[in-house]
């Protein structure tokens, strides 16, 4: 029985090999799970672990709530949504991958049908009938533990999308629209779903509106449609100036500020004193205004001319007669003033405008508005939206209402409402999802303010205006689309409910829902085939944010600004990692610490700073919240109490970098690596690399192929362990305990007692993945790194996956590199490698190819998989079993048969002789043709697995049965082990209960009244322990319970075995017309060879030019030959100096390992070794690694693992300094400049200068020459031109183009050229003739007319020109 100990400081794998860190900054917070963005999003979508009453209005729940209840057209019946539950998936992830199925769970929704009594006169009508039922709504794909989906047997990832946030955005055209370069401002209300509403200025400063980017209309039409009259519109947008007629003089109410900047058209005096303030013709300044305010002038007498041309703010009506003298927005004329005087109207309200900050835009717009009433405005909008349809009042009103004011058609969403309110200055963050009149008014007001110079336009590339849409949200949208389709069908059927007594199940057809979901996961632009080359590529793929996809940008339309690095990317999106090429800047990667908030905006963590003192409190800030804060960088100098020491601190504020005093600082970065993404954080000395090369380095690490033996990098960054454990490729312990059993294919753990809960098994069995094919044909294989009896904790790594070494990411190999030219073989980034690398299989990789053979039901009969193939010799069938399927372990080469298959041929007319032969010898096998699966050209390897899938209901062949047996044996083995451990646990408890108890009787020599001893128990069979009778009733009851537990265990195991058996034995659901599928997996070993692409982590890539014998390689004075020679000219111009520093530190790491190996070989004491390790790990007196927590055995294991070199970590932007590298080299007794004398292997002479030699981590990339090169003799031809196809996939030929023809013409090689252009290309007759000639041993050629010339003739004839060749 295992008992847990106190949580140790280091994990099981870490203790075996510590990585020495040079980081100066302590990590305040751990790096969050790297896949959390995917996992959390989908968890929130499904809400499976939440009770129905506690479910939030998101995900599936929100989709159902938004569509239901569905009412019938008559209103007499409705369907209501009660809740949903997800069932259990039929197959687990591994089985789904093998069988080519989707990993999904059935969705059952509880629907309530409410029928109202239509005959009742009451309102609301009384309920006549309620029926509830669980309705099956299709299958919902489930996310695996590592953030992927298995769709049709392949792993896929749904990439998050970065799209424009809903809300309102104000922008201008940058002067591009009008030739004068005038800025035209516009506003756009973007809903989450629904019509877009645009407001824009034209060059004449009128305001227009567009709905869904259609024809523009004056904005006043929209305002009239909302029910505003001209008077209301003017009062909303303008301040008014009131004018009174007193004693024949016009007095205006004076607000002095309004006169600023105007030129006085008359003298302005102080009424009381007559003092002149402004002379006629002078501009009114701030000084004049002060004087007016001082004199407390209330009104100003203005000449009549001053009023002419001003605009009326209100309608002018003669109250006695009701006669309209003038409309609001009319200009004041001489006639109008006379008419007003005649009618006794003594007061006029005018709108106040000026050219500076109170433009007359809305007034000008009203003047060009053709409509005069609300109805006319609605009709005008109807005509614009539905041109050609005759408008009616009802139709126009309904259309306008449906555009922006109905929840079904329009939704701003919570994010949109929050962004909208904040932008237009509404205090609350919440509000309706539809628009209101006030919303539209406030947008137009804000737009006019911006035009008037108050406020700024928005930056659409600011991360406060772009949000992330993750998997859960996208799936919810698709689900809603499906539900809306269902709703239409249900509405029609609901009217039949009363008459036909239907149930909810009969009304709802779930097909549209499952079709929408299937389409999204199967073919959406954002549901992508997972990049599985290595663990890092998988992690990066799941953390990717794309601006492309439905509702996003397109490559062609995206400009430079969208792609560029923005200041708000800091700590949210990586400025380095993005693809090269057309997608640059559109596809980004999340930064290491970034996460999304409830609104979908990317947040980054910051430490709170109070009065210049840094606290350990961490807050997440989005780009919106960050703007007004002063944020310092993480490497600011602090004292022991956390006070900032510098007088001026560099910080970020208002999206700018500036210097400020410590007391102003509000926040501080959490870590130096929070700027970059996962891939970039794995590049050591990133701070010394040019950004363009770092970009290549980040991207190329994702293409590194897993090698046969993974080797950890000597120089890393400390992120390796985190990436490996979060990626899901290694096996991580779910619970702590003791390793009970380990072999190559599984690990059995006996779990600690305190980590098991009632009803759970105390056994964890981890089945390892062995030689499994990844999406990119690389090999996924797991190897245990624990031994029987090891005590492990939860979270410890139990088995390494591909590209992991002792739980650390290991993408390549450490090679001894020399920077020097070597006979021109490293010209232009070529790489020269030693034969030893090939011999030691350092870069040998395993690739697994999947080849499929399908037997179908054809018109002529069924295809058959068999070993009886016509016209094939015995030797070709030697690798096949009696079922016609290749044996596992067979080594096959190109052209070998893997699966024998025959297809029926069409009946042919037989000659009399054939008829006779057939009559004598019976049915001949001539009616079938060989269509076997053969190994494609250029491929050879070993068969490692075969899967046979047989259609349900067909007889399985012997091979399929033997595969099933193996499968069952594996399941049986797991269950037996689990049962053994659980039985031992029960018997352990029984013996604990029985020992030293007084017995009243029992099997064997047990006398009543005697005590039970261990000897007695050892003699009696365990099964009979339950027959022992005991005085103590409580103990007897416990024994009874344990006995029942044992019985239940047996039943449970039987049930589980039978369930598994049923799954394994059942037939497969194959596509229509398919009878049987055989999948053969070939393991191909690829050694490194010239033409393969290699790279370091700093963007230093190259192609291998030659493999040199070890004895010819440059070597050091002690005889050690270098592994690889790189060109020194590749460093200065590329500015990736990080590779040189890595080389130096790598040399030190290896040298220290050599010193430790020497100490171990000399059998030095553990104390001496510990003292040396202290010097290495805690070089600057700071305790980074606590060696005291290791006992002597653990210390010696650690030292032994360091023989190959001491792994180092130099975190990005916080790495080793030049001085630290030198001190490490000195500690290892190596030259401090990292340069070594090298000797030429061929001559034995020393090279003139010392050479930089050290260890660099090199990767082999997934661009292998074997995949790119192929050879063709004959093959397929293009249909029209009859020329060979191109490319390896089509088994094509080499193009001999125009320029190549010129080259042969220049040499005068006429016959060679003729051969190239005729018999080797498209002379159909000539090429068959030469084939026959060669067979007959005659090597002459007889060229004819190339087919392409005939095509040309046909094309000329198509133009109506009669062209014919004259034959001599």
From Swiss-Prot:
Keywords: DNA-directed RNA polymerase, Nucleotidyltransferase, Transcription, Transferase. GO terms for molecular function: DNA binding; DNA-directed RNA polymerase activity; ribonucleoside binding. It catalyses: RNA(n) + a ribonucleoside 5'-triphosphate = RNA(n+1) + diphosphate. GO terms for cellular component: DNA-directed RNA polymerase complex. The keyword Transcription applies. GO terms for biological process: DNA-templated transcription. Signal peptide: none annotated. InterPro entries: DNA-dir_RNA_pol_bsu_ext_1_sf (IPR042107), DNA-dir_RNA_pol_bsu_external_1 (IPR019462), DNA-dir_RNA_pol_su2 (IPR015712), DNA-dir_RNAP_su2_dom (IPR007120), DNA-dir_RNAP_su2_hyb_sf (IPR037033), RNA_pol_bsu_bac (IPR010243), RNA_pol_bsu_CS (IPR007121), RNA_pol_bsu_protrusion (IPR007644). Its EC number is 2.7.7.6. Belongs to the RNA polymerase beta chain family. The RNAP catalytic core consists of 2 alpha, 1 beta, 1 beta' and 1 omega subunit. When a sigma factor is associated with the core the holoenzyme is formed, which can initiate transcription. DNA-dependent RNA polymerase catalyzes the transcription of DNA into RNA using the four ribonucleoside triphosphates as substrates. This is DNA-directed RNA polymerase subunit beta. It comes from Legionella pneumophila (strain Paris). The lineage of its organism: Bacteria, Pseudomonadati, Pseudomonadota, Gammaproteobacteria, Legionellales.
């Amino acid at each position: 029985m295992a008992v847990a100990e106190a949580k140790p400081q280091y994990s099981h794998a870490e203790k075996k090999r510590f990585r020495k860190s040079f980081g100066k900054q302590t990590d305040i917070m751990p790096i969050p799970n790297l896949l959390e963005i995917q996992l959390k999003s989908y968890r929130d979508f499904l809400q499976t672990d939440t009770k129905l009453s506690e479910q939030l209005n998101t995900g599936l729940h929100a989709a159902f709530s938004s569509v239901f209840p569905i009412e019938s057209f008559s209103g007499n019946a409705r369907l209501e949504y009660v809740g949903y539950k997800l069932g259990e998936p039929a197959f687990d992830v591994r089985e789904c991958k093998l069988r080519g199925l989707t990993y999904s769970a059935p969705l059952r929704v509880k629907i309530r049908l409410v029928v109202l009594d239509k005959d009742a006169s009451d309102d609301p009508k009384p309920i006549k009938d309620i029926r509830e039922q669980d309705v099956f709504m299709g299958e919902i794909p489930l996310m695996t533990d590592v953030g992927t989906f298995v769709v049709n047997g392949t792993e896929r990832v749904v990439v998050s999308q970065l799209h424009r946030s809903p809300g309102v955005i104000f922008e201008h055209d940058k002067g591009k629209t009008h030739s004068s370069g005038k800025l035209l401002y516009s506003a756009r209300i973007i809903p989450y779903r629904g019509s877009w509403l645009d407001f824009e200025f034209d060059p004449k400063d009128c305001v227009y509106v567009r709905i869904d980017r259609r024809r523009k209309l004056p904005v006043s039409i929209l305002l009239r449609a909302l029910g505003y009259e001209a008077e209301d519109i003017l009062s909303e947008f303008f301040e008014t100036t009131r004018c009174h007629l007193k004693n024949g003089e016009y007095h205006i109410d004076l607000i002095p500020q309004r006169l600023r900047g105007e030129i006085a058209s008359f003298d302005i005096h102080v009424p009381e004193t007559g003092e002149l303030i402004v002379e006629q013709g002078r501009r009114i300044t701030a000084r004049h205004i002060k004087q007016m305010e001082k004199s407390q002038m209330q009104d100003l007498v203005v000449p009549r001319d001053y009023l002419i041309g001003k605009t009326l703010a209100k309608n002018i009506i003669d109250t006695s007669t009701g006669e309209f003298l003038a409309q609001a927005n009319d200009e004041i004329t001489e006639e109008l003033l006379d008419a007003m005087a005649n009618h006794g109207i003594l007061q006029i309200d005018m709108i106040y405008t000026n050219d500076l900050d109170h433009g007359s835009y809305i007034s000008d717009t009203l003047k060009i508005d053709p409509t005069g009433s609300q109805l006319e405005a609605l009709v005008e909008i109807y005509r614009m939206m539905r041109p050609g349809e005759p408008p009616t009042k009802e139709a126009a009103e309904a259309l306008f209402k449906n555009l922006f004011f109905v929840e079904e058609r329009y939704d701003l969403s919570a994010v949109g409402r929050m962004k909208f309110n904040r932008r237009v200055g509404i205090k609350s963050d919440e509000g309706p999802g539809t628009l209101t009149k006030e919303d539209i008014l406030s947008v137009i007001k804000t737009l006019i303010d911006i035009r008037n110079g108050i406020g700024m336009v928005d930056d659409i590339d600011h991360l406060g205006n772009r949000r992330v849409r993750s998997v859960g949200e996208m799936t919810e949208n698709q689900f809603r689309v499906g539900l809306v389709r269902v709703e239409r069908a249900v509405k029609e059927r609901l009217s039949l409910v009363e008459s036909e007594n239907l149930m909810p199940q009969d009304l709802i057809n779930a097909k549209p829902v499952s079709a929408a979901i299937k389409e999204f996961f199967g073919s959406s632009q954002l549901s992508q085939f997972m990049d599985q080359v290595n663990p890092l590529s998988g992690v990066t793929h799941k953390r990717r944010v794309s601006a492309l996809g439905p509702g996003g940008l397109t490559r062609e339309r995206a400009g430079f600004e969208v792609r560029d690095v923005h200041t708000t990317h800091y700590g949210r999106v990586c400025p380095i990692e993005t693809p090269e090429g057309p997608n640059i800047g559109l596809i980004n990667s999340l930064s290491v610490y970034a996460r999304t908030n409830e609104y979908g905006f990317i947040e980054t963590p910051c430490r709170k700073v109070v009065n210049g003192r840094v606290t350990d409190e961490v807050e997440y800030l989005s780009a919106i919240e960050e703007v007004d804060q002063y944020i310092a960088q993480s490497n600011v100098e602090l004292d022991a109490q956390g006070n900032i020491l510098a007088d001026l601190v560099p910080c970020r504020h208002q999206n700018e970098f500036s210097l400020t005093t410590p007391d102003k600082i509000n926040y501080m970065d959490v870590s130096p690596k929070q700027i970059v993404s996962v891939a970039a954080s794995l590049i050591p000395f990133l701070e010394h690399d040019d950004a363009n090369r770092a970009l290549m380095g980040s991207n190329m690490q994702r293409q590194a192929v897993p090698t046969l033996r993974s080797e950890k990098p000597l120089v890393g960054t400390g992120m390796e362990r985190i990436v490996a454990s979060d990626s899901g490729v290694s096996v991580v312990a779910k619970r702590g305990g003791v390793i009970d059993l380990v072999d190559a294919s599984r690990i059995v753990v006996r779990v600690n007692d305190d980590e098991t809960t009632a009803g759970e098994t105390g056994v964890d069995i981890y089945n390892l993945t062995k030689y499994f094919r990844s999406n990119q044909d690389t090999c996924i294989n797991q190897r245990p790194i624990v031994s029987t009896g090891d005590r492990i904790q939860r979270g410890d790594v139990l088995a390494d996956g591909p590209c992991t070494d002792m739980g650390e990411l290991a993408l390549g190999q450490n090679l001894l590199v020399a920077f020097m030219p070597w006979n021109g073989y490293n010209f232009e980034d070529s790489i020269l490698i030693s034969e030893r690398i090939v011999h030691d299989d350092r870069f040998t990789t395993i690739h697994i190819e999947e080849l499929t053979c399908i037997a179908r039901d054809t018109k002529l009969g069924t295809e058959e998989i068999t070993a009886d193939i016509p016209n094939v010799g015995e030797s070709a069938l030697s690798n096949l079993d009696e079922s016609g399927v290749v044996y596992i372990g067979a080594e096959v080469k190109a052209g070998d048969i893997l699966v024998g298959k025959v297809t029926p041929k069409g009946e042919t007319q037989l000659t009399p002789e054939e008829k006779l032969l057939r009559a004598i010898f019976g049915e001949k096998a001539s009616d079938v043709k060989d269509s076997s699966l053969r190994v494609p050209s250029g491929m050879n390897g070993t068969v490692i697995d075969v899967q046979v899938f047989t259609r349900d209901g067909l007889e399985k062949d012997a091979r399929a049965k033997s595969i099933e047996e193996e499968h069952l044996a594996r399941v049986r083995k797991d269950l037996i082990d689990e049962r053994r451990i659980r039985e031992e646990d029960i018997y352990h408890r029984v013996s604990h209960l029985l020992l030293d108890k007084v017995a009243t009787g029992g099997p064997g020599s047990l006398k009543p009244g005697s005590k039970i001893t261990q000897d007695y128990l050892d003699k009696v069979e365990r099964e009979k322990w339950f027959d022992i009778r005991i005085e103590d009733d409580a103990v007897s009851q416990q024994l009874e319970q344990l006995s029942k537990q044992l019985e239940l265990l047996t039943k449970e195991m039987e049930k589980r075995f039978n369930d598994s058996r049923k799954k394994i034995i059942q037939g497969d659901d194959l596509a229509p017309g398919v009878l049987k599928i055989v999948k053969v997996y070939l393991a191909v070993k690829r050694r490194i060879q010239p033409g393969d692409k290699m790279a370091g982590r700093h963007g230093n890539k190259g192609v291998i030019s030659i493999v040199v014998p070890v004895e010819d390689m440059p070597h050091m004075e002690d005889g050690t030959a270098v592994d690889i020679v790189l060109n020194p000219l590749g460093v200065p111009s590329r500015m990736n100096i990080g590779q040189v520093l890595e080389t130096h530190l790598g040399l030190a790491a290896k040298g220290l390992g050599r010193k430790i190996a020497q100490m171990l070989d000399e059998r030095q004491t553990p104390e001496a070794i510990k003292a040396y390790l202290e010097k290495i790990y805690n070089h600057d007196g700071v305790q980074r690694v606590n060696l005291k927590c290791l006992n002597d055995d653990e210390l010696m294991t650690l030292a032994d693992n360091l023989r190959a070199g001491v792994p180092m970590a130099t975190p990005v932007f916080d790495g080793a300094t030049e001085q630290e590298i030198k001190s490490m080299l000195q500690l290892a007794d190596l030259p401090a400049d990292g340069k070594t004398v090298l000797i030429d292997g061929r001559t034995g002479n020393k090279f003139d200068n010392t050479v930089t030699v050290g260890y660099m981590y090199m990767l082999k990339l997934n661009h292998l020459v074997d995949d790119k090169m192929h050879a063709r003799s004959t093959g397929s031809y293009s249909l029209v031109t009859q020329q060979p196809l191109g490319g390896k996939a089509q088994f094509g030929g080499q193009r001999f183009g125009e320029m190549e023809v010129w080259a042969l013409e220049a040499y005068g090689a006429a016959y060679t050229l003729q051969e190239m252009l005729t018999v080797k290309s498209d002379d159909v007759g000539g090429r068959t003739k030469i084939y026959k000639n060669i067979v007959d041993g005659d090597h002459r050629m007889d060229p004819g007319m190339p087919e392409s010339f005939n095509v040309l003739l046909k094309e000329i004839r198509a133009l109506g020109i009669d062209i014919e060749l004259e034959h001599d």
